[in-house]
Regions:
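Secretory targeting signatures
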Residues: 1-47
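Extracellular, repeat-based ectodomains that mediate carbohydrate processing or recognition
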Residues: 40-399
Length: 399
């Protein structure tokens, strides 16, 4: 997950700037030819830049004058996570390693402590934006997860090798933090704030169900919580990350046919489901959907639609209601997408990344199963080239 925000001042509806980067065939890691730990400035080009409206159609508006610097740290690391502390240090977690850069990505060093796991089945990382606590989560088979944490930019660590709630068999592990509320688990949280200021959440799949736990001791243990009841227990399980808003609202996205967000207002004690996106649906098999919240707790839910474009629905009342007319994020020229991610800053300022392809000539040709390819990235052959698309909007709340 990348924190990418840029300035844009438009007055005509929600406007999106899309920048296309780094071509490669197939799905997986993006590779460059520069040395490990170095940084490479992206090439300037007049192609691969789109300015679109909420329908994915092009607008006659000049793009932002953006410059990008890329680092190849961890380019072969599976399922990476990234976070930034208030000191400006960047933490990149993949496989069992925690890599740190305090010079804007120009150089990197490994800072994994002996209190952290030396093996992994699935990694995940999180930086608490309020306390700067760095969490390194390493799944140990399907039985449990080993979580270690640092409060001094990775100089020292503490850890718990069995730190994944009360119920074993976990997969698709996620961790996040957020403020305590005044109800549910928040009542106990108000008493534990002297130990750690924030609630810490740990969620995972068990079969097709979602389990979520809340920690009262800064992530050292997860004793409160269990299976989320409702749609998420019987249809798809967890696939997106956990998101917590500044007002304490928590969001989890299930892997279901109709785009859905599961919301808690009491630090994970109870959960409600909210659906949207019936106008665009989802593909099969269904992939990641994600939620981001801005500094005023407006929520932005993105997912891959049934036509393989990336779509968004917004909530301006802390997840109580969601717009039912979906906004297209990806340009119409992009006919296949996967792995969308979103982040938000000040109100209306969002950044989205995803992998996408414009190889429309491959539509209808045999896919990996020998069927006519419809644009579903899950079935794409190596003849389909995917790019990293980076999308910006400064007025994502406009109608």
């Amino acid at each position: 997950m990348c924190d990418l925000l840029a300035a844009l001042n438009m007055k005509t509806g929600s406007t999106l700037i899309v920048v296309m980067m780094l071509s490669f065939s197939g799905l997986g890691c993006i590779h460059t030819n520069s040395g490990v730990g170095g940084a490479e400035e992206s090439l300037n080009t007049d192609t691969g830049i789109f300015v679109t409206g909420p329908d994915g159609e092009s607008l006659d508006i000049p793009p932002l004058p953006l410059e990008f610097v890329f680092s190849d740290v961890g380019e072969e690391g599976a399922e990476p996570s990234i976070g930034i502390t208030s000191s400006g240090c960047i933490f990149f977690i993949a496989f069992e390693k925690v890599m740190r850069s305090c010079d804007f990505g120009q150089s990197w060093e490994e800072v994994t402590g002996p209190e952290c796991s030396f093996t992994t089945s699935d990694p995940y990382g999180w930086v608490d934006p309020v306390t700067d606590r760095i969490f390194n989560v390493q799944m140990q088979g399907l039985e449990t997860s080993w979580i270690c944490w640092s409060d001094d930019d990775g100089e020292s660590w503490l850890g718990n090798p069995h730190d994944s709630g009360t119920t074993p068999l976990n997969d698709h592990i996620k961790l996040a933090t957020g403020p305590w509320t005044s109800s549910g688990y928040g009542i106990g949280g108000s008493l534990s704030q002297s130990f750690y200021d924030q609630a810490v959440y740990y969620c995972y799949n068990k079969g097709v169900g979602i389990f979520c736990f809340t920690s009262f001791d800064g992530g050292a243990t997860f004793e409160a919580g269990g299976q989320i009841f409702g749609l998420a227990t019987s249809n798809g399980g967890l696939h997106g990350a956990i998101t917590s808003a500044p007002d304490g609202t928590v969001y989890v996205t299930p892997r279901v046919e109709t785009p859905t967000v599961i919301v808690s207002k009491d630090n994970g004690f109870t959960w409600d489901e909210h659906s949207m996106g019936e106008d665009v649906g989802t593909p099969y098999p269904r992939k990641n959907s994600e939620v981001a919240t801005d500094t005023q707790s407006n929520a932005y839910h993105i997912w891959t639609g049934g036509d393989e474009g990336v779509y968004m629905s917004r909530s301006i009342d802390s997840g109580e209601t969601w717009e039912q007319t979906s906004i297209r994020i990806s340009p119409k020229e992009v006919i296949s997408t996967t792995f969308p991610q979103v982040d938000a800053g000040d109100p209306g300022k969002i950044a989205i990344t995803y992998l996408g392809s414009e190889n429309s000539s491959e539509l209808g040709k045999p896919d990996i199963d020998g069927e006519n390819w419809t644009g579903n990235a899950h079935y794409a052959t190596t003849n389909v080239s995917y790019y990293l698309y980076i999308t910006f909007s400064l007025n994502a709340l406009d109608s």
